[in-house]
Amino acid sequence: MGLGKGKDEYKLAATSEDGGKKDKKAKAKKDMDDLKKEVDLDDHKLTLDELHRKYGTDLTRGLSSSRAKEILARDGPNALTPPPTTPEWVKFCKQLFGGFSMLLWIGAILCFLAYGIQAASEDEPANDNLYLGIVLSAVVIITGCFSYYQEAKSSKIMESFKNLVPRQALGIRDGEKKNINAEEVVLGDLVEVKGGDRIPADLRIISAHGCKVDNSSLTGESEPQTRSPDFSNENPLETRNISFFSTNCIEGTARGIVINTEDRTVMGRIATLASSLEGGKTPIAIEIEHFIHIITGVAVFLGVSFFILSLILGYNWLEAVIFLIGIIVANVPEGLLATVTVCLTLTAKRMAKKNCLVKNLEAVETLGSTSTICSDKTGTLTQNRMTVAHMWFDNQIHEADTTENQSGTSFDRSSATWANLSRIAGLCNRAVFLADQSNIPILKRDVAGDASEAALLKCIELCCGSVNEMREKYPKIAEIPFNSTNKYQLSIHKNTTPGETKHLLVMKGAPERILDRCNSIVLQGKVQALDDEMKDAFQNAYVELGGLGERVLGFCHYHLPDDEFPEGFAFDTDEVNFPTENLCFVGLMAMIDPPRAAVPDAVGKCRSAGIKVIMVTGDHPITAKAIAKGVGIISEGNETVEDIAARLNVPVSEVNPRDAKACVVHGSELKDMTSEELDDLLKHHTEIVFARTSPQQKLIIVEGCQRQGAIVAVTGDGVNDSPALKKADIGVAMGIAGSDVSKQAADMILLDDNFASIVTGVEEGRLIFDNLKKSIAYTLTSNIPEISPFLLFIIANIPLPLGTVTILCIDLGTDMVPAISLAYEKAESDIMKRQPRNPKTDKLVNERLISIAYGQIGMMQATAGFFTYFVILAENGFLPMDLIGVRVLWDDKYVNDLEDSYGQQWTYERRKIVEYSCHTAFFASIVIVQWADLIICKTRRNSIVQQGMTNRILIFGLFEETALAAFLSYCPGMDVALRMYPMKPLWWFCAFPYSLLIFLYDEARRYILRRNPGGWVEKETYY
């Protein structure tokens, strides 16, 4: 989609009715590909005459009002198109019917169906299935509301773009200046902007006076950019004669012609790109889907098997259908949906305390799966404040303190040359501290002025005391501000220092320009002639500091002779009447936006965690490379192609790119790369820096990483980052410096803008994945002792050992707090020392977990329950062998003389009291064996002795489930409400040996696992 080609080319071809969905899909893909292309704009290359012909605009009088109206009618208002939004009710329904909820809904529907069948075929149907259906529905609705509340976020991306649109613009129509509503600005309009204005559309500058714009939201460059009518670069994003919609004019004035409006502006394209990107499923959503498939598979397999078996055993088909439904429902872990949601919420809260605000619960785990981080440079890896890093004076480079708390090195300040240099930096400087900040640390104070001048001001204030007092001592008489032609700034001050002349001229600017204006230099406080040796020394220092990616400024002064410039002399800065040549060079000062203190350590942690960190920035390659080396993205000893060429003293073209582990890629190189070349680059280089990238390229880089199978996290703060943030598996925006747009596009916000907080997030994400596995293993284990009574009831025709209501008391009662308590479990080992999990092989729930939970521990638990059941019935006279086949008579309410093993007769009422006592005891047995299960689930590899019992919530969970079980058993009225009967104290102890057996069995399994890593036991049982 080329820009600046006139409206009609953008009219979308109407798709014919029968073209159908294929055409629409193909068209959407084509539009998307067009948006991803670089800005195609040639207006910056046109002369003023050509512009006049193209847009029909009079370059002094502007458009006529009637012509402007025509264009407005043709093109529509200068406003961004809002994206299609998802209604809130649809979002709510997604929470209610998405993923795991669907399984529970199916369970609920089957329960109602079973109850319906029973109600139709029996006189007095049992209400168990009805209760179960109601409870399942309630669980889904409550959890859905909770999740919706947690994620009540709408895709407000475009709304925040609306905040970028300036309300009013100063246009020139019919030769008159008029305030026009920004939405009415049209193609070809002549517009004026001044300092403080927001640019109303993409403009081609035709005249400017000291105009600087802040393009940081668009390109990521923190330095203000000069704007003038000069065509300075082939790239429209870097040329001086174009200013972009919604960027800010900081100072000066400019006049320009509107070359693009609304969605066709560069910012509009980014907006459209961000809002039309589809985010994929989160890794945890994929895991839960996989888990549902496993559980459903097991449930349907068991259900169908026993359905067929019950028909073979002679049950009628209605009974068989009820059994089928019962088995499928019994397999559904009712409490797991709530457990997973609560676990993720707890982690989200824990992350918020560590400055990571999670907008989307599932993103909590995504960060833990991350294998590649594409990080922005400015403000994320760096402090987002220009700081003086080095000075060169007395023919020596001195290092300044760039740390955030001024705990670094300090340089020798005793030299008279430093006194001269600091005086120039303080006086030839228009930056000032804002009022009432005397009690705020110098580095944290707000400054009015540009970033470089603010850096100099803070440096001098730190090193030499109050700059204000210095300026009062040397009052300013005249000044020539910095401009792009001269490349210097100059001011003249009254000088009250004894032994010096009455006027002092100070100048700063581009080092080579300043040196050209000097014929002497200050060394150790003494003036010497500027010879070739000193010029070479200057050149070496300049190259060295420039090579560190620093912005270097030169400083010089001149004591104006009193005989020519007496007190009261009228200095004229237009017709310059004072010397600007043959001055005295004093030194250099170099500034950089320094890395944050915690970042190198964080990057190191990422590396040991197997996470690749890629820097993607709009800044210059040299600066980007310097910061990348400073923070360890390019590690010590790793060379780029350019480094190898320099070391071997050969041309870059002769070096094999595969020999270089690191590489710095310029946006212009990336522009010419095919997808295959980009894939090759990402595959074969471990350390990569992309510099001078455009927003579209950021998106292409993210897609490239995803093609490699990486789970990608992207950090960003500008509007330019929003497409990449949206496309990434997890977008991380900056809370302080971030634009509204980037925060809306992201899944997570760093409240302190610090890259190190991401590493904390990765750690929490990995931990919650491990702990969710433990939680699920714990919850699923009790499924077997819950299902097996039902299966034996069908096959062996014994009285039902465990009722539906009792199962609910386990799943939604006693098991809930212990399962959630596992979310608080600490890591077993250093989780940041292992590789990121492979989403294809390392699943949340795998066959081994099912085998342990169902096949091993679950079976032991079921045995414990049946042991208790048979003990109680035997105590009451029914020996195990006599129970087989007794079910039909047992459940017949008209049989009141059923004989036990000793010939005693039992009425229906008395039999049922014994049966319900068995249900209660079976329930208590499950609680007791779940003690051991909870303790063994604390760890997947370590011994419990190593892991310790420091998780207080888990200990509380053990007491809570026991207390709840006792309450349900002994509370008066429970026999009526839940059919729970008081138990003899001895019955509690039936399951104790099994609980101990489970504990010892799993300790032995983990001991073998630790002794033989990679052995048979690990392959078969390590989940």
UniProtKB/Swiss-Prot annotation:
Q: In what ranges is there compositional bias, type Basic and acidic residues?
A: 1-11
Q: Which residues form the propeptide?
A: 1-5
> Which Pfam families does the protein's record reference?
Cation_ATPase (PF13246), Cation_ATPase_C (PF00689), Cation_ATPase_N (PF00690), E1-E2_ATPase (PF00122)
- What are the coiled-coil residue ranges? none
Q: Which GO terms describe its cellular component?
A: membrane; plasma membrane; sarcolemma
Q: Which UniProt keywords apply?
A: ATP-binding, Cell membrane, Ion transport, Magnesium, Membrane, Metal-binding, Nucleotide-binding, Phosphoprotein, Potassium, Potassium transport, Sodium, Sodium transport, Sodium/potassium transport, Translocase, Transmembrane, Transmembrane helix, Transport
Which spans are transmembrane here?
88-108, 132-152, 289-308, 321-338, 773-792, 803-823, 844-866, 919-938, 952-970, 986-1006
Q: Which BP terms does GO give this entry?
A: intracellular potassium ion homeostasis; intracellular sodium ion homeostasis; potassium ion import across plasma membrane; proton transmembrane transport; sodium ion export across plasma membrane
Catalytic site positions: D376 (4-aspartylphosphate intermediate)
Q: Which residues lie on this side of the membrane: Extracellular?
A: 109-131, 309-320, 793-802, 867-918, 971-985
According to UniProt, the reaction catalysed is:
K(+)(out) + Na(+)(in) + ATP + H2O = K(+)(in) + Na(+)(out) + ADP + phosphate + H(+)
Assembly state and interactors? The sodium/potassium-transporting ATPase is composed of a catalytic alpha subunit, an auxiliary non-catalytic beta subunit and an additional regulatory subunit.
What protein name is recorded for this chain? Sodium/potassium-transporting ATPase subunit alpha-1
Q: Which species is this UniProt entry from?
A: Oreochromis mossambicus
